[in-house]
Amino acid sequence: MALDKVAPIVIVTPFNVMTDRYDEFIEKVRKALAGTAGAKVGPKPKSKVESPVLDKGTFPVEQPPRWIHVELHGKTQGTTTPKPKVAIRSDDAYIMGFTNSTGRWFQLSKTGTTYKLVDDKAVMAGFDGNYNTLVGGVNNLPTLNLNKFSMAQAAAALWNKASTLSGGIGSDVVDDDDGDMLRANDPVKQAVATLAVAVCEAARFSPVSKVVNAGWIKDKVSVTPDEVNYIKEWGDLSTALLSWMDKQYKDDATIFKKFNGIGITNGEEALAVVRLVKLVIRSNMAAAPTTDEQLLAYAQLPKHGRYMAEVFAVRIPATAGGDRPAAPSLCTAATAAATSFTARKKNTPRSKPAATARVTWSSLGHRLATSAYGPIVFNLDLHDGNCGQADEEEDEKNTGRIVCDAIGGDFSNYNKAISETVLTRCGPAEVIYAVLSNGVQGRVDVKLAGLQSRDEVVLVGRIVARSKLFDFGCVLFYNEAAGVRVRPGELVPLARHALAVPLHMPLTIELDIRHGGSGDEIVRGELEFKTAIDGLHTGRLVGVNDAEFEVTILWSEYPW
């Protein structure tokens, strides 16, 4: 994909690795990365330091607001050594590309990626900048030596990347067909990882820059598990700091409670750690990437997920002046892989007529996300109190069926919301679903973690999961009538747990929970989770009177 325009470039004063002061260099990088809006977190004059907020984010496959170029110099034995540049996004402080000895740009993307970001003639490096790809995971960062000699070696490795080109300087082909797979001691991946920590993570976190600076001229210096914990929590720490600022720098105990385990209990302690605040964009605040170019660009992102299907809703149009179906309605979907789920319609009060019936999904048989490695069949058995009971033959006749041949040669509607209507015994029903080309399973649980009273409480409201890739959300919990009874420490009974989620796009869990009967708010807010191919991610949301809900997501790339 041709690059129409490169974002504005900010050039940091070149850094001579062997002679310049590292601490002064990192301050220059922080200054360059500070967002153009000028926002800073820190209650002046009380706070000793203010942390700048980065530029507002764009999609990973789009140009950032600005590029920050850092040029590395060095001298050994009287000769000038490599002067490569690295390109850092201004919205997330991630390295996205680097130059070699000829000045050619290499983009940190898998071989075959068609979209260009750092330069119109950029060559794909053959791997992305994820720590899983670079060093086997963030927990392996302490294995990196971050002293000045290692940083000089990293610069040399980028400079020597020219040797991997085939077909000459004009070629965009890289001899790295398995470049997205981790290879032991790959010098270029090690170099990118070293610079990512010694430059980017050091700019984000004071503890990282202090560790590197203290060991800059020593034989070996590495981050510790303490710094790794900060790196893991950067997004959530940024969100907490922004929330703290919005609340006039009050309510520290509530806002920073989830970080007590890593030694952060209040805003001042968070500011002492975080020097650059990421402006986290919630999924319901940004438009989904629905243009053909955006979807094509998304399809070019590293594919570590699987083909999966996700259903957002089954809509049943109400007849004019009538009531919507009152009895339970079932919808099942299955593929050749024999994965399935069951949906059960939940009724809303008749005093609140609507154009469509609300459908959520029951967990009956729905233990796994739906595979899309075969044709997907949707069976809708909808009935109301007037339809009566039908025998098996009539049930088969009146069951609406939609078949999506996702493995057919002409199927191309990946990563888009698809709407199809089928005739059922109760009239037409619309199914809205998507087939993902790069999906992972997220198994969601929501727990009432804390309440002022240990007594049972009746919960009403809704819990919705929403991916940034789509305008639609998946209803996990919906109850506006009798409510459900839950005690502190117990799980909220969700209608479904297993979701098929697009990789590389954040997943937001939105909670709007109230007391049954009084309708008083218990908690209202949202938690954003970064999608992953494995691992257990946890987030906490604190509501009125210290009511606390814990959301956990267990990620899996191949759940079947």
Curated annotation (Swiss-Prot):
This is 60 kDa jasmonate-induced protein. Residues 37-56 are annotated as: Disordered. One of its GO terms (biological process) is negative regulation of translation. The lineage of its organism: Eukaryota, Viridiplantae, Streptophyta, Embryophyta, Tracheophyta. Keywords: Hydrolase, Plant defense, Protein synthesis inhibitor, Toxin. It is an enzyme of class 3 (hydrolase). It catalyses: Endohydrolysis of the N-glycosidic bond at one specific adenosine on the 28S rRNA. The active site is at residue 201. GO terms for molecular function: rRNA N-glycosylase activity; toxin activity. Belongs to the ribosome-inactivating protein family. Type 1 RIP subfamily. Induction: By jasmonate. It comes from Hordeum vulgare. Its EC number is 3.2.2.22. InterPro entries: DUF6598 (IPR046533), Ribosome-inact_prot_sf (IPR036041), Ribosome_inactivat_prot (IPR001574), Ribosome_inactivat_prot_CS (IPR017988), Ribosome_inactivat_prot_sub1 (IPR016138).
